Protein backbone atom coordinates (compact mmCIF):
# COMPACT_ATOMS: atom_id res chain seq x y z
CA UNK A 1 0.00 0.00 0.00
CA UNK A 2 1.00 3.60 -0.38
CA UNK A 3 1.51 6.12 2.38
CA UNK A 4 0.55 9.75 2.24
CA UNK A 5 1.66 12.51 4.57
CA UNK A 6 -0.58 15.53 4.91
CA UNK A 7 0.82 18.61 6.56
CA UNK A 8 -1.44 21.00 8.42
CA UNK A 9 -1.62 24.35 6.75
CA UNK A 10 -0.53 27.48 8.58
CA UNK A 11 -3.31 29.86 9.48
CA UNK A 12 -3.48 33.30 10.97
CA UNK A 13 -5.50 32.70 14.13
CA UNK A 14 -5.06 36.04 15.83
CA UNK A 15 -5.06 39.75 15.27
CA UNK A 16 -3.13 42.32 17.25
CA UNK A 17 -3.10 46.08 17.51
CA UNK A 18 0.32 47.66 17.85
CA UNK A 19 0.65 51.24 18.96
CA UNK A 20 3.79 53.24 19.44
CA UNK A 21 5.64 56.47 18.91
CA UNK A 22 9.18 57.75 18.69
CA UNK A 23 10.81 61.11 19.34
CA UNK A 24 14.34 62.14 18.46
CA UNK A 25 16.04 65.48 19.13
CA UNK A 26 19.55 66.74 18.49
CA UNK A 27 21.09 70.17 19.09
CA UNK A 28 24.53 71.50 18.23
CA UNK A 29 25.98 74.73 19.48
CA UNK A 30 29.11 76.77 20.01
CA UNK A 31 30.43 78.83 22.91
CA UNK A 32 32.95 81.41 21.86
CA UNK A 33 35.25 80.34 19.07
CA UNK A 34 36.78 77.23 20.62
CA UNK A 35 34.04 75.28 22.40
CA UNK A 36 31.72 73.11 20.33
CA UNK A 37 29.04 70.94 21.88
CA UNK A 38 26.05 68.78 21.04
CA UNK A 39 23.28 67.17 23.03
CA UNK A 40 20.47 64.91 21.97
CA UNK A 41 18.44 61.84 22.60
CA UNK A 42 15.59 59.64 21.58
CA UNK A 43 12.52 58.24 23.32
CA UNK A 44 10.24 55.52 22.00
CA UNK A 45 7.35 53.46 23.32
CA UNK A 46 5.19 50.67 21.90
CA UNK A 47 2.53 48.27 23.18
CA UNK A 48 0.58 45.41 21.62
CA UNK A 49 -2.92 44.16 22.38
CA UNK A 50 -4.73 41.06 21.11
CA UNK A 51 -7.90 42.08 19.24
CA UNK A 52 -9.01 38.69 17.89
CA UNK A 53 -8.28 35.15 19.07
CA UNK A 54 -10.33 31.97 19.33
CA UNK A 55 -10.48 31.66 23.12
CA UNK A 56 -13.96 32.93 24.01
CA UNK A 57 -13.84 31.85 27.67
CA UNK A 58 -10.33 33.23 28.22
CA UNK A 59 -9.08 29.81 29.32
CA UNK A 60 -5.67 29.84 31.02
CA UNK A 61 -5.13 33.56 30.39
CA UNK A 62 -1.68 33.58 31.98
CA UNK A 63 -0.35 31.33 29.18
CA UNK A 64 -2.89 31.72 26.36
CA UNK A 65 -3.94 34.67 24.31
CA UNK A 66 -7.39 36.20 24.68
CA UNK A 67 -9.11 39.27 23.29
CA UNK A 68 -7.89 42.28 25.24
CA UNK A 69 -4.66 40.67 26.45
CA UNK A 70 -1.74 43.06 26.67
CA UNK A 71 1.28 41.29 25.23
CA UNK A 72 3.80 40.64 27.99
CA UNK A 73 1.31 40.25 30.85
CA UNK A 74 2.60 38.60 34.02
CA UNK A 75 0.00 36.86 36.16
CA UNK A 76 0.65 36.07 39.77
CA UNK A 77 -0.47 36.33 43.38
CA UNK A 78 -0.50 39.20 45.81
CA UNK A 79 1.54 38.60 48.94
CA UNK A 80 1.40 40.23 52.36
CA UNK A 81 4.89 39.43 53.53
CA UNK A 82 6.41 36.39 55.20
CA UNK A 83 4.90 34.39 58.02
CA UNK A 84 6.80 35.29 61.18
CA UNK A 85 5.69 32.94 63.96
CA UNK A 86 4.39 29.39 64.27
CA UNK A 87 1.15 30.80 65.64
CA UNK A 88 0.71 32.96 62.54
CA UNK A 89 1.54 29.97 60.32
CA UNK A 90 -0.98 27.75 62.15
CA UNK A 91 -3.69 30.38 61.72
CA UNK A 92 -2.87 30.70 58.01
CA UNK A 93 -2.97 26.91 57.52
CA UNK A 94 -6.26 26.56 59.41
CA UNK A 95 -7.95 29.51 57.71
CA UNK A 96 -7.15 28.81 54.06
CA UNK A 97 -7.23 25.81 51.76
CA UNK A 98 -3.69 25.88 50.37
CA UNK A 99 -3.74 22.46 48.70
CA UNK A 100 -3.73 23.91 45.17
CA UNK A 101 -0.26 25.28 45.80
CA UNK A 102 1.22 22.61 48.05
CA UNK A 103 0.34 19.66 50.22
CA UNK A 104 2.85 20.83 52.81
CA UNK A 105 1.98 23.01 55.77
CA UNK A 106 3.16 26.62 55.70
CA UNK A 107 5.90 27.46 58.19
CA UNK A 108 7.45 30.69 59.51
CA UNK A 109 9.48 32.17 56.67
CA UNK A 110 7.05 31.04 53.94
CA UNK A 111 5.23 33.56 51.76
CA UNK A 112 1.78 34.66 52.84
CA UNK A 113 -0.28 34.70 49.64
CA UNK A 114 -3.49 36.73 49.76
CA UNK A 115 -7.06 35.49 49.31
CA UNK A 116 -8.29 38.15 46.88
CA UNK A 117 -11.76 36.69 46.26
CA UNK A 118 -12.40 35.82 49.93
CA UNK A 119 -13.32 32.18 49.33
CA UNK A 120 -10.80 30.87 51.88
CA UNK A 121 -8.86 29.15 49.09
CA UNK A 122 -5.60 30.24 47.50
CA UNK A 123 -5.79 29.12 43.87
CA UNK A 124 -6.43 30.16 40.28
CA UNK A 125 -10.18 29.62 40.42
CA UNK A 126 -11.56 28.11 37.22
CA UNK A 127 -8.47 29.28 35.35
CA UNK A 128 -10.56 31.48 33.08
CA UNK A 129 -10.51 35.21 32.55
CA UNK A 130 -13.73 35.61 34.54
CA UNK A 131 -12.48 33.51 37.44
CA UNK A 132 -8.75 33.44 38.09
CA UNK A 133 -9.30 33.03 41.80
CA UNK A 134 -6.55 34.90 43.59
CA UNK A 135 -4.35 35.52 40.56
CA UNK A 136 -4.23 38.83 38.73
CA UNK A 137 -2.00 40.75 36.35
CA UNK A 138 0.95 41.96 38.43
CA UNK A 139 3.34 43.19 35.75
CA UNK A 140 4.38 43.22 32.12
CA UNK A 141 7.60 42.25 30.35
CA UNK A 142 7.18 44.72 27.47
CA UNK A 143 10.03 47.26 27.47
CA UNK A 144 8.47 50.72 27.80
CA UNK A 145 10.01 54.13 27.22
CA UNK A 146 13.25 53.04 25.58
CA UNK A 147 15.63 55.97 25.45
CA UNK A 148 19.09 57.18 24.57
CA UNK A 149 20.91 60.31 25.74
CA UNK A 150 24.06 61.53 24.06
CA UNK A 151 26.32 64.53 24.39
CA UNK A 152 29.72 65.76 23.31
CA UNK A 153 31.97 68.74 23.90
CA UNK A 154 35.29 69.71 22.36
CA UNK A 155 37.84 72.42 23.09
CA UNK A 156 41.13 72.97 21.30
CA UNK A 157 41.59 69.36 20.25
CA UNK A 158 40.26 67.80 23.45
CA UNK A 159 36.93 66.00 23.01
CA UNK A 160 34.57 64.21 25.35
CA UNK A 161 31.53 62.24 24.22
CA UNK A 162 29.14 59.90 25.99
CA UNK A 163 25.97 57.96 25.37
CA UNK A 164 23.47 56.56 27.85
CA UNK A 165 20.73 54.10 26.99
CA UNK A 166 17.97 52.58 29.03
CA UNK A 167 14.43 51.42 29.55
CA UNK A 168 12.04 53.41 31.71
CA UNK A 169 9.65 50.62 32.67
CA UNK A 170 9.77 46.84 32.45
CA UNK A 171 8.96 43.94 34.76
CA UNK A 172 10.58 40.58 35.23
CA UNK A 173 9.28 37.83 37.49
CA UNK A 174 11.37 34.80 38.49
CA UNK A 175 9.85 31.40 37.77
CA UNK A 176 9.45 28.66 40.34
CA UNK A 177 12.68 26.99 39.31
CA UNK A 178 14.77 30.08 38.70
CA UNK A 179 17.50 29.04 41.12
CA UNK A 180 19.74 31.89 39.97
CA UNK A 181 17.24 34.27 41.58
CA UNK A 182 16.15 32.24 44.59
CA UNK A 183 19.60 30.93 45.53
CA UNK A 184 18.25 27.53 46.55
CA UNK A 185 16.92 24.43 44.88
CA UNK A 186 17.67 20.87 43.88
CA UNK A 187 20.29 21.30 41.21
CA UNK A 188 24.06 21.44 41.23
CA UNK A 189 24.03 24.75 39.37
CA UNK A 190 22.41 26.55 42.32
CA UNK A 191 24.58 29.59 42.88
CA UNK A 192 24.50 31.52 46.13
CA UNK A 193 25.35 35.22 46.02
CA UNK A 194 25.64 37.68 48.87
CA UNK A 195 22.09 38.88 48.10
CA UNK A 196 20.75 35.43 48.97
CA UNK A 197 22.11 35.60 52.50
CA UNK A 198 19.25 37.95 53.33
CA UNK A 199 16.85 35.03 53.88
CA UNK A 200 14.31 34.61 56.65
CA UNK A 201 15.33 33.36 60.07
CA UNK A 202 13.81 34.20 63.45
CA UNK A 203 16.80 36.52 63.93
CA UNK A 204 16.24 38.14 60.52
CA UNK A 205 12.47 38.71 60.38
CA UNK A 206 12.71 41.58 57.87
CA UNK A 207 14.54 39.44 55.30
CA UNK A 208 13.83 39.81 51.61
CA UNK A 209 14.13 36.14 50.65
CA UNK A 210 11.88 33.43 52.14
CA UNK A 211 12.90 30.03 53.49
CA UNK A 212 15.67 28.60 51.26
CA UNK A 213 14.42 25.07 50.65
CA UNK A 214 16.65 22.43 49.13
CA UNK A 215 16.16 18.74 48.42
CA UNK A 216 15.80 16.11 45.72
CA UNK A 217 14.48 17.29 42.36
CA UNK A 218 11.42 15.06 42.62
CA UNK A 219 10.28 16.34 46.00
CA UNK A 220 11.43 19.91 46.40
CA UNK A 221 8.62 21.57 44.45
CA UNK A 222 6.05 20.89 47.17
CA UNK A 223 8.20 23.03 49.49
CA UNK A 224 9.25 25.59 46.91
CA UNK A 225 5.60 26.11 45.96
CA UNK A 226 5.13 27.77 49.35
CA UNK A 227 7.67 30.48 48.62
CA UNK A 228 8.40 30.86 44.91
CA UNK A 229 5.07 31.47 43.20
CA UNK A 230 4.97 34.45 40.89
CA UNK A 231 3.90 37.27 43.18
CA UNK A 232 4.06 41.02 43.54
CA UNK A 233 6.49 40.59 46.45
CA UNK A 234 9.19 39.30 44.13
CA UNK A 235 8.26 41.24 41.02
CA UNK A 236 11.44 42.85 39.71
CA UNK A 237 11.89 46.16 37.94
CA UNK A 238 14.06 45.56 34.87
CA UNK A 239 14.25 49.28 34.11
CA UNK A 240 17.79 50.55 33.80
CA UNK A 241 20.09 53.31 32.67
CA UNK A 242 23.53 52.38 31.35
CA UNK A 243 26.52 54.41 30.24
CA UNK A 244 27.09 52.55 26.98
CA UNK A 245 30.05 54.57 25.78
CA UNK A 246 32.44 57.22 27.04
CA UNK A 247 35.23 58.50 24.80
CA UNK A 248 37.93 61.05 25.57
CA UNK A 249 40.29 62.02 22.77
CA UNK A 250 43.11 64.50 22.15
CA UNK A 251 44.28 65.70 18.75
CA UNK A 252 48.01 66.28 18.88
CA UNK A 253 49.07 69.71 17.59
CA UNK A 254 49.94 69.63 13.90
CA UNK A 255 53.42 70.88 14.68
CA UNK A 256 54.03 67.74 16.75
CA UNK A 257 52.58 65.22 14.32
CA UNK A 258 54.29 66.75 11.29
CA UNK A 259 57.67 66.39 12.94
CA UNK A 260 57.23 62.62 12.77
CA UNK A 261 55.82 62.60 9.26
CA UNK A 262 52.11 62.44 10.09
CA UNK A 263 49.39 64.74 8.86
CA UNK A 264 47.27 64.09 11.95
CA UNK A 265 47.48 62.08 15.16
CA UNK A 266 44.93 61.45 17.89
CA UNK A 267 45.12 59.54 21.16
CA UNK A 268 41.95 58.31 22.80
CA UNK A 269 40.45 56.42 25.71
CA UNK A 270 37.12 54.65 25.27
CA UNK A 271 34.97 52.73 27.73
CA UNK A 272 31.81 50.69 27.20
CA UNK A 273 29.21 49.65 29.78
CA UNK A 274 31.05 51.54 32.51
CA UNK A 275 28.05 52.35 34.72
CA UNK A 276 24.67 50.72 35.19
CA UNK A 277 21.81 51.96 37.34
CA UNK A 278 19.10 49.37 38.03
CA UNK A 279 17.04 47.98 40.90
CA UNK A 280 17.67 44.38 39.85
CA UNK A 281 19.60 42.09 42.23
CA UNK A 282 23.32 42.40 41.66
CA UNK A 283 23.69 39.03 39.89
CA UNK A 284 21.45 40.08 37.00
CA UNK A 285 22.20 42.22 33.97
CA UNK A 286 19.15 44.17 32.73
CA UNK A 287 20.12 43.60 29.09
CA UNK A 288 20.52 39.83 29.56
CA UNK A 289 17.82 38.97 32.07
CA UNK A 290 15.32 37.69 29.51
CA UNK A 291 17.76 35.23 27.91
CA UNK A 292 19.42 32.04 29.10
CA UNK A 293 22.58 30.28 28.00
CA UNK A 294 23.40 27.09 26.09
CA UNK A 295 23.43 24.99 29.27
CA UNK A 296 20.13 26.12 30.71
CA UNK A 297 17.27 28.21 29.41
CA UNK A 298 16.82 29.74 32.84
CA UNK A 299 16.20 33.45 32.34
CA UNK A 300 18.94 35.73 33.53
CA UNK A 301 21.48 32.99 34.12
CA UNK A 302 23.92 34.46 31.68
CA UNK A 303 27.15 36.36 31.48
CA UNK A 304 26.65 40.10 32.04
CA UNK A 305 27.61 42.70 29.48
CA UNK A 306 31.37 43.13 29.52
CA UNK A 307 32.98 46.37 30.54
CA UNK A 308 35.44 47.24 27.80
CA UNK A 309 38.31 49.71 28.19
CA UNK A 310 40.29 50.78 25.14
CA UNK A 311 43.31 53.03 24.66
CA UNK A 312 44.57 53.77 21.19
CA UNK A 313 46.15 56.05 18.67
CA UNK A 314 44.69 57.10 15.33
CA UNK A 315 47.13 58.42 12.76
CA UNK A 316 46.78 59.85 9.27
CA UNK A 317 49.83 59.56 7.08
PLM feature segments, named:
Residues 7-12, 134-137, 231-235, 296-301:
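Extracellular loop and loop/strand-boundary signature of outer-membrane beta-barrel proteins
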Residues 169-266, 271:
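Extracytoplasmic gating/loop element in the C-terminal half of outer-membrane beta-barrel translocons
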Residues 33, 157-160, 255-256:
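Repeated loop/turn-to-beta-strand initiation elements of outer-membrane beta-barrel proteins
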Residues 25, 39-41, 162, 267-269, ...:
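Membrane-embedded beta-strand positions of outer-membrane beta-barrel proteins
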Residues 11-17, 21, 28-139, 181, ...:
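Conserved small-residue
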Residues 27-29, 43-49, 155-157, 166-170, ...:
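Transmembrane beta-strands of outer-membrane beta-barrel pores
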Residues 22-24, 305-317:
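Outer-membrane beta-barrel "beta-signal"
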Residues 1-6:
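Short, small-residue-biased leader/transition segments that mark boundaries at the very start
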Amino acid sequence: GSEMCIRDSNTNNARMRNRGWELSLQYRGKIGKDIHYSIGGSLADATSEVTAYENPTGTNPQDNWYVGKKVGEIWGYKASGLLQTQEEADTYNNTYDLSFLSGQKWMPGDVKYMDLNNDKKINNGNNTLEDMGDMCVIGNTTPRYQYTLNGSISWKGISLSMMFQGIGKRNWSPDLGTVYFWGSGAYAQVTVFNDHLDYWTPENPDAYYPNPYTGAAGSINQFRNKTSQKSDRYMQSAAYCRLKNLTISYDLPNSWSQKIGLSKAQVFFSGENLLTFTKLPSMFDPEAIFTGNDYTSEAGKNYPMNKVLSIGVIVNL
